[in-house]
Amino acid sequence: MSSALQVVCLSSLSLIGVVQCQNASSNANHSSSIQDLPSYMQYINATRNDPSPVTLNIDLNDKSARNSTASDLYGLMHEDISHSGDGGIYAELLANRAFQGSNYNSTAIPGFNGSLIGISENPVEATAPVLTAWAPIGEDVRMTLDRLHPVSKALPTAMEIDFPLDADGEVGFQNFGWWGMDVSPQEYQVSFYVLGNYPRNQANLTNFHVSLRSNLTGEVYATSTISDVAVPYIDYLKLSTTLHPNMTAPSSNNTFVVSFDGDQVKGQTYYFGMFSLMPETFMDTRNDLRKDIAEAFYDMKPSFLRFPGGNNLEGLSPQQRWKWWETLGPLVDRPGRVGDWGYYNTQGLGLMEYLQWTEDMDIERMLAVYAGFSLDVYGQSGASYPEDQMHVILQEALDELEFCMGNTSTYWGARRAALGHPEPFPIKYVEIGNEDWFSSTYSYRWPYLYNGLKEAYPDIQYISSAYDENEYYNISIPAGEVWDTHHYEEPSYFIRNFDFYDHWQERTNNSGVEVSLGEYSAIQIDTPSGIVNYSFPADLHIFYPRLVSALAEGVYLLGMERNPNVCKFASFAPSLQDLNWYNWTPDMIAFDADPSHTVLSASYWQQWLFAHYRGHETLPVTNTEGDFNPLFWVATIDNEKNAVYVKVINTLNTSVPLTVNMPQKYQSINGTILTGADLNSYNYIYNQTEVVPKPINFTNAPVTYSSSSNGTFQWDVPRYSLNVLEFGL
């Protein structure tokens, strides 16, 4: 996706309080029916208006005609976009916890070439630290930023709190979180660093009161006191405690408070840095993943995770690229970086956290390594490492792989062990760069990095981030490796290209090369031109994945399932979106600070269904009546369950008769359907189940159903539906 096309919610440049920006949930007519929609939104352009019957003969006898399915086809892609990392799946509840940097927005400015930083949270120095999300408590309590007392080399900015000489009652400060924070019965881990000012330090012992409170009523949900602290003035002291609320707050509009007795701290100055408020995390491990979001991912049964990007891998300059080694170790030693998507990245979600994520979910790692090309606020035409300096980038990638997989006798393997994981993290897949068709230099960067990495790690499968997209050159991808292609399209594109991967290797002279659909989504409704408008006009743009998205994307993925010798991976992107700040829509999962607001989209449920019913081998299917479009199908067999899965999608606005013939009697038939009131149905905060999988009751359904002893099944496939039929043999 293009980083120059940011759709940043500018109202969220101010994080203080809970300010939800205008988005699809706030101004869409959620109750509209298909009768209210314009005619062009009631059908898919590429669908043939032909409800003629379809008859499929599934061959169970000729095992030589089967192909093994792509076992890793369905997976996840994650980069920190739309606050999907900080404020998202990274469970940290405090915004701007270490005063590392601030938000910005690149935009075109009349009279200048390309884009520039047009709006920045810090008006003097773009991306520089700010006090956003923090506020003082108590009359005349002064809060400023301080660079004279750095917490660490990585974190040079602290927060200075000056208490007036007449301080009385409760004084202190609070953090409003990422547009609020969830408070519920669980254990919260709290830590922060504090330092005193020597001339003002009165050498008394201080009580630190830590609490979670309602930002609306002031009600205290949990509190803890760290008593009799002798605050030092040379080296920072790290304080830690836990909080245990015994109730669920009625909303997420809550705050984290550090407070004092004014009489105890009057006239003093303290410096604070590197705060953390961490709830219980997914599987209670060191992955630091927010439970509800991680559980939604886990429930999809993904096979891989592509990380850490995406554009966010590349940086807005080579200096601001994702430097994996800076994401390791204690949080106080992680400097963070200017992210590609308009906000500073804390890098709390670092390389070790990503690796732990994959280990906890038992999925393969698709590690994307920096390939010597960075973006720029100007646009996509960023800087590339010259060929005579590519050895630096190759060594970075080799070191990263040594960190992941090296034994403990190696430098980086020992570093991994010192961080608590002596066992290696096996890496099967490495992607070299991201969307390098935007660059004019991948023609030398790809072979340089590929050859160097292949020599050192010959068993890894390498993924090229470009092939034929750049009009000036094609990339030669060796047999056994993978091409990563990205598609943000109209629904009809996916349907018209259902057969794109049929004979793809032969047609393109790419013998032995496989394909990864690394990013995809239906991004706008069908238009006469079929051209995606990346300015995202509201009347065309799809903000939340709709039923039409799930159907069209599903058809394209059926085309991939039919070609497992070519199609290796598929991952929807972007995967996550904070409803208060988004750079890009649609996204697979939308969320805010309240876990009950996490929305699993129609596209999520499409991939959930396909991943749950994969099968081990594809089955040969002959259509003796009818053809593809408006019905699309694929059949696989699950050898462990001794079951046949038939995935059938109907993209027409009326039912289509289907007959399935098998050479033997089936013992049972079960089905699951994904559909909705109309093509534009979608899930949102206040109706999260508009488009969700539901079991098919064949005997009581308002469609014709019959089965016979010879393995014949007849059913009218409902209009606008994605279905999985399970035949128990």
What are the language-model segments listed below?
Residues 245-248, 253-257, 282-302, 347, ...:
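An active-site-proximal structural segment forming one wall of the substrate-binding cleft
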Residues 276-286, 332-348, 371-373, 379-391, ...:
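The substrate-binding groove and active-site-proximal loops of carbohydrate-active enzymes
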Residues 80-81, 90, 99-102, 313, ...:
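Aromatic/acidic polysaccharide-binding cleft in carbohydrate-active enzymes
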Residues 279, 308-311, 376, 408-440, ...:
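Active-site groove signature of glycoside hydrolases
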Residues 630-665, 671-676, 721-724:
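Carbohydrate-binding surface patches
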Residues 254-269, 416, 436-557, 563-566, ...:
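Noncatalytic carbohydrate-binding groove/subsite architecture in carbohydrate-active enzymes
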Residues 22-311, 315-346, 364, 382-391, ...:
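Extracellular and organelle-lumenal recognition/adhesion modules and their flexible linkers in secreted
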Residues 1-24:
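Fungal secretory targeting signals
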